[in-house]
Structure formats: structure tokens, C-alpha cells
Amino acid sequence: DKSKVELSWEATPDHSESTSNATSFNVYMATGTSGFDNGTNIKSNHHIMELEPNVQYNFYITACNNGGESFPTEVLSAYYQPQATETILVVNGFNRLSGPAVINNEDEQGFDLREDIGVSYGKTLGWNGYQQVFSKYNAGTEGPDGLGFSDESLAGKVIMGNTFNYTVEHTEAIATAYKYNIVSSSSEAAFARKLNLDKYKCIDLILGLEKSTTNSLKYYKTFTPDMQRILQQYTQQGGSLIVSGAYVASDMKSFTDKQFLENVLKINYSPTDSCTNNSSITGLGLNLNLYNYYNDTHYAAPKTDIIHPTSSAICAMQYADQTSSAVAYKGSDYSCFTMGFPFECIINKEARNKLMRGILNYLLTPKQ
């Protein structure tokens, strides 16, 4: 029954404390533009429910036991379109939480917030300003010449980080096409063979600010080797791909990484191709503005990737300096559309929705 959706999840075991295991789960739900309800407590790790047509449903889950309630999962979304013959899978691959870029070499030491301010869990007030002095030779010096001295440009400034709810914006945008059923998944579930990807006409992969850094506590690679292999197999079966993120190409450094970019996403990338003049983007008949500045409502992408098409693909969008911000490929085998910026960082909702409709039309309309 296409009007029913099944939520399923796995508890995270704490091997250091046996009494911390979950005994039940709270399922929180929001419909349309309303807020989340107070949750429904269930004992199992799956939940089936009926969807009203043309209404977006958003969900998150917490684990419960006698000690209380866990942090929430990411938000996942679903949408039932009665006339739809195809289903689109939205995959959240933006899981990164990280401190800022670290400099630590023979001569310099510190946190380089201009290079990368990091990603907080939700909002943070954690920064006073940008470090000005990095030289280790200034260690022990007091005042503006001392190692670690910073300005006060970020004092009192609230900066939004990762809110783990970007499937909501992507599902909203896809739903405005009124053509597709929409389901969603975490990247861990999608690429651990927890679901059959070949069932889906198109995968929309959210990568946000995902990237691997030496100072992260976890591995946040944009495309892990498993993901690369599975997405290659998916496209070989004729599946369409939408990918967006600030580091979709720059996080791909090895030879096999670059082969994946060229062979699957049809992207050529040079390590120097990072764009900071990225506040405005044009393409598909649209002028778009990005959150490329720190603010308290949405995470920012101050640096994004310049991605060039291979000979079989096209440049579909451009930054203000005429460099390529998106690459599109429409072959007889499969189609894909890759943005070197996070789709959800487009400020205007109507522009976001129009862009998504244009991308879907390009990818899923049969080639003449």
C-alpha cells in the first residue's frame, strides 16, 4: 500500500554500560508546516502508519529507558502523492560535527577559523574572534603580539551549526513537483544495504558541510569507498542522482576518489578550485543567493567547490565570477546533477523549490 510508510531504526548499544540499553522509543511527528507533537512511545524498532495524500510528514526518534531519554535522531521525511508512479529517496549524508581547522606545525599553532570554523551541534556562542597570531616564537608574549591573540569580531555572535533536519527542505522542494512519492533515510542505513536502492527512480544525497578532517573525532568522508561502489552500481542500473554539498569534490583526494568524480558524477576538479565569492549563483533561469555568511538561523557555506564538467557533461550553474557551480549529465545510461554548494543553503524557499523542479525535470524527463 503506497499510502503507508514504515519507520525503522536500530538502537545504539553502549558497550560500556549494560543498564543504558533502550527499553522503548519515542516517535515524534510533524505534518505540513506544524511543529512536532509530544511523541508516541513504542516498544519495537519499527512503526507503520498511514499517510494523508499531499501532506509532508517529518519524524525523529529518541531512545528511552529508566534513566531518561536520548538525544534525538536526525529528522526524516515522507510524502505520499496518489498520482505518482515513481519514488524519490532523500538521503541525509550531512552528519559532521567538528571543531575549527587546526594549525600545528614547526612554526605555527592555533585555530584557523577563516579556513574552517567547524560545525557545532545546533547554535553556538563559542567564538570570540579570529586568531591573529599563530607564530610559536611569540609564545609567552602578552598582548596583541602573543601567540593565540584574537580579535573580537565574533563576540556575542550566535552561529548556527548542523540541525540534522535538511531532509525537510529537500522533501518540501521535491513535493512541489506533485509527481513523486518521497521517502528518506540516513546515509548509514542507505549505504549499509538496509534498503534496496534500485527501487528508487532518483536519489537526492545531502552532503552539506560533510568532509573528512584530521582533527575530527569521527570519519566524515563525503563519499566513503562503500558509498562510491554502491552509487556506481545504482547508476549502472539506470538510477538518477542529485548530489549537493560544499566539499563534494575537494574532499575527494585519492586516485580512486577522483575516478569516482569523473566516471560517476562527470566532474573534473582541481585542488585550487574553492570559491569564496559564492553569495550569488545563476542557472536554470534562476538567480539564487546563498547563506555564505554566519548567522543564527541556518548554517553557512562560506567556501564552496568549483566543479567543471567532463566532456560528456555540461556546466549547469555558475557563481558570480562565472566559475562553474553545478555539473549536469544526461546520458542514455543514467542522469546526474551535482552542485558544488549545499542546496539547502539557498536562502529563498521559492527559488529552492523552482531549482529542484528544474533539476528533476532535467533528470527524469526521457531523453529525446
Which stretches of residues belong to each language-model region?
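Aromatic-Pro/Gly-enriched surface loop or interdomain linker
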Residues: 72-200, 206, 361-368
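A glycine-rich, often tryptophan-bearing local segment used as a flexible ligand/cofactor-contacting loop or short
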Residues: 209-304, 308-313
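A glycine-centered loop/beta-turn motif at secondary-structure junctions
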Residues: 236-244, 285, 292-368
